[in-house]
Amino acid sequence: MTPIVSLEGRTIVVTGAGQGIGKALVETVIELGGNAVAVDLNAETRGTVVAAQPADQVLAVQGSVSDSALANRAVAEAVARFGAVHGLVNNAGIIRPAMIEKMTDQQWQDVIDVHLTGSFYWTRAVGQHMLERVKGGDKSGGSIVNSSSDAGRKGAMGQINYAAAKAGMLAMSMTIAREWGRHNIRANSVCFGVVETPMTEVIRGEKFRDGIMAQIPLGRWSTPQEAVKAVCFLLSDGASYITGQHLGVNGGFHISL
């Protein structure tokens, strides 16, 4: 029987691969038989992740996701190394929290550049390659997964920049699905709740912990390892008829008032 989730022979580009969800994604993609292109700004954390994986299944790329030229070069390197790119996970993220009236132009722009503009650059670069493959007769298409958040659906106090960017990523997934669906290129979003990563340390701290936990029916945070299972499913042929969707992986947080 064919496994529901397999990435055997697939090459997946993962941005923000140095820690948290991205690190777990690289590990799981390789565990499922795929190749991972690990993209991260931090050379040290990215290097640690890559060093722990089989050298013939991973390609390291250092730089900012908001650099469009880097996206183009990385895709070209991945194709030269592995033959093709079959999937993309736009996972890189930062937070610059502040209430609306106190948020600076730079705080706003930093978050938009990484989450929204960066996701567009990498989607365009990977999508151009996928479309070329389709023109060449390869009908396998591809899968793009945007790492969004419940903040994009419900808003987030003190994070209008983050919430707006994540909402934009939801719209991006639906637009990709509409434009490229006829080429068998799928696009979906995963809306994470609170995952145990370095980026969520503040909201998992004593000041906010009890209030947020009370809104999660399962009563616990997600681990990166369980969070990425949904992403890998959407990348796989098990999700071959799923596109334009927003999948909540949040312990039920989205149904809380």
Describe the role of every protein-language-model region:
Residues 32-47:
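Conserved glycine-rich Rossmann-like NAD(P)H-binding loop of the short-chain dehydrogenase/reductase
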Residues 189, 210-238, 242, 249-251:
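C-terminal helical subdomain
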Residues 149:
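Residue(s) in the substrate-gating loop at a strand-loop-helix junction
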Residues 181-186, 242-244:
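Short, small/polar-rich loop/turn modules that mediate ligand/substrate recognition or access, typified
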Residues 99-100, 104-112, 212:
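Substrate-binding pocket helix/loop in short-chain dehydrogenase/reductase
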Residues 123, 165, 173:
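Active-site helix of classical SDR
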